[in-house]
């Protein structure tokens, strides 16, 4: 059985995945509270805040991967 490859990007990804678990839990909890009292503006604001924080975190993860992809592509291009 082959051993899965592990490298720097895997470590970076794992750190993002660990952080996003907590944020996902917070978003879910805020949504559950909002669903119980949909007319409460404080709960709506809390949900929007948590969702925005989650989106920012995921965007950072996506941008990090894209930067490394671009760097790798530039390195490969320089060898041609």
Curated annotation (Swiss-Prot):
Changing residue 16 to A: Can only secrete early substrates such as InvJ/ScpT, PrgJ/SctI and PrgI/SctF. Can polymerize into filaments in vitro, but not in vivo. Cannot enter cultured epithelial cells. This is SPI-1 type 3 secretion system needle filament protein. Pfam families: T3SS_needle_F (PF09392). The levels of PrgI/SctF are reduced in an invA/sctV mutant, probably due to protein instability, and are increased in an invJ/sctP mutant. Induction: Negatively regulated by PhoP-PhoQ. Changing residue 58 to L: Non-invasive phenotype. Changing residue 75 to A: Shows a specific deficiency in the secretion of the translocase SipB/SctE. Shows fully assembled needle complexes, but has a reduced number of needle filaments. Is able to invade cultured epithelial cells. Changing residue 49 to A: Exhibits constitutive secretion of substrates. Retains the ability to display SipD/SctA at the tip of the needle filament. It comes from the Bacteria. Changing residue 66 to E: Can secrete only early substrates. Can assemble needle filaments in vitro, but shows a filament assembly defect in vivo. Can invade cultured epithelial cells. It is found in: Secreted; Cell surface. The core secretion machinery of the T3SS is composed of approximately 20 different proteins, including cytoplasmic components, a base, an export apparatus and a needle. This subunit polymerizes and forms the helical needle filament. Interacts with the needle tip protein SipD/SctA. Interacts with the needle adapter protein PrgJ/SctI, the secretin InvG/SctC and the minor export apparatus protein SpaP/SctR. In vitro, the needle protomer refolds spontaneously to extend the needle from the distal end. One of its GO terms (cellular component) is type III protein secretion system complex. Changing residue 11 to A: Exhibits constitutive secretion of substrates. Retains the ability to display SipD/SctA at the tip of the needle filament. Changing residue 56 to A: Exhibits constitutive secretion of substrates. Does not display SipD/SctA at the tip of the needle filament. Is non-invasive. Can polymerize into filaments in vitro. Component of the type III secretion system (T3SS), also called injectisome, which is used to inject bacterial effector proteins into eukaryotic host cells. PrgI/SctF1 forms the external needle filament that protrudes from the bacterial surface. Is probably involved in the transduction of an activating signal, thought to be mediated by the distal tip of the needle filament, to the secretion machine. Required for invasion of epithelial cells. Required for the secretion of the effector protein SptP. One of its GO terms (molecular function) is identical protein binding. Disruption phenotype: The null mutant strain is non-invasive. Deletion of the last five residues prevents self-association and yields monomeric proteins that allow biophysical studies. Forms a right-handed helical assembly with roughly 11 subunits per two turns. The location of the negatively charged surfaces are radically different among the needle filament proteins PrgI, BsaL and MxiH. In PrgI, the major negatively charged surface is not on the 'face' but instead is on the 'side' of the two-helix bundle, and only residues from helix alpha1 contribute to this negative region. Changing residue 80 to K: Exhibits constitutive secretion of substrates. Can invade cultured epithelial cells. Changing residue 77 to E: Can secrete only early substrates. Keywords: Protein transport, Secreted, Transport, Virulence. GO terms for biological process: protein secretion by the type III secretion system. Changing residue 80 to E: Cannot secrete the translocase SipB/SctE and SptP. Retains the ability to assemble needle complexes, but is not able to invade cultured epithelial cells. Changing residue 76 to A: Abrogates host cell invasion and effector secretion. Binding of bile salts, including deoxycholate, to the PrgI:SipD interface may inhibit the T3SS function.
